[in-house]
Amino acid sequence: MENVVIVSAVRTPIGSFNGALSSVSAVDLGAIVIQEAIKRANIESALVNEVIMGNVLQAGLGQNPARQAALKAGIEKEIPSLTINKVCGSGLKSVALGAQSIISGDADIVVVGGMENMSQAPYLLDSKVRQGVKMGNLTLRDTMIEDGLTCASNHYHMGITAENIAEQYGISRQAQDELALRSQTLASQAVQLGVFDKEIVPVMVKTRKGDIIVSRDEYPKADTTAEGLAKLKPAFKKEGTVTAGNASGINDGAAALILVSESKAHALGLKAIAKIRSYASGGVDPSVMGLGPVPATQKALKKAGINLDDIDLIEANEAFASQFLGVGKDLNLDMNKTNIHGGAIALGHPIGASGARILVTLLHNLIEKDKKLGLATLCIGGGQGISMIVERL
């Protein structure tokens, strides 16, 4: 079976909600990382066989946002593109689909990744407007909440699924806040030290006062304290434990990687960062969707023929502190090797991009720490999880 190698991995900075990147569409963010990933891979765009990009909040973006991003990035019109939606797992599923395409022999080089601008998610009128409204009020529907952050099976916010896990596992408010503080501290230190600079492509943003360059993550809060977190009110249940401080953010950003068959990489003289060892998805009850990484990781480890102890570094998406801690309990995650520079609670969670983003960060962390095996994993709204294991070369 043909090995699949990764020859470049890049992301934009992550912007805060209505922040520095809010005026840059998901399509434009996607185009920026696609173009930069190709540049860093040192290949001609004409050699690309397909572009696959995750994107969740597609309402109003137009047909096939991945196709739009590819064309804006300068990809030739003859090269096809696919947009996929697996909620928070979209960006990592795009990598798995690209790998499958190469393994099957359908492609040699695939651009994969994810893109999201949650700040630009539109509001919708009810569909009955098409039949005519004779009287009464109309309610606008927030596509960000409805299509991105609401459990379609149980009709409640993702935050309630985090509360469910906290109750099921007896995870205290203090434990959640302690994880949030860890994430903020590590991420803020990493930003200050420029740890993420090598994985980030700066974004030029046009403003009324002229062009500005956004080159660092906007969301981490260096002034976060335990006392400040403790003062925050529960966000989803009156007597709950999940707050805005121990949950991930609402954010904008994109990430992309170039996948190449090992034989093609050798033929072109490309330097591979890593090879994909395995990937897997799993399902859990939608009411505790945050536990999805558990079966997904167990399956991925089995496919790779290794144990979790063999993994050197882990990037586990922090959708919610309680969710992360529940997964940590079930998998017995070693915190010394997990989210070593913070996670989504501090960095942010642009949902369609996050799967690719954590893989990009994982790859650069493996290089930084001179480690070999890495695991990337995310929970997925609706009750799923996705995991991928890579081996640095």
UniProtKB/Swiss-Prot annotation:
Enzyme Commission designation: 2.3.1.9
PROSITE patterns assigned to the protein according to its UniProt record, in alphabetical order: THIOLASE_1, THIOLASE_2, THIOLASE_3
Chief location category: cytoplasm
Catalytic activity: 2 acetyl-CoA = acetoacetyl-CoA + CoA
UniProt-recorded Gene Ontology molecular function terms: acetyl-CoA C-acetyltransferase activity
Pathway stated in the Swiss-Prot or TrEMBL entry: Metabolic intermediate biosynthesis; (R)-mevalonate biosynthesis; (R)-mevalonate from acetyl-CoA: step 1/3
UniProt enzyme class: transferase
Keywords on record: Acyltransferase, Cytoplasm, Fatty acid metabolism, Lipid metabolism, Transferase
One GO term of the biological process aspect: fatty acid metabolic process
Subcellular location: Cytoplasm
InterPro entries: Thiolase, Thiolase-like, Thiolase_acyl_enz_int_AS, Thiolase_AS, Thiolase_C, Thiolase_CS, Thiolase_N
Secretion signal span: none
Active site positions, chain numbering: 88, 349, 379
Entry's Gene Ontology cellular component terms: cytoplasm
Similarity annotation: Belongs to the thiolase-like superfamily. Thiolase family.
Protein name per Swiss-Prot or TrEMBL: Acetyl-CoA acetyltransferase
Organism encoding this protein: Haemophilus influenzae (strain ATCC 51907 / DSM 11121 / KW20 / Rd)
Lineage, highest ranks first: Bacteria, Pseudomonadati, Pseudomonadota, Gammaproteobacteria, Pasteurellales
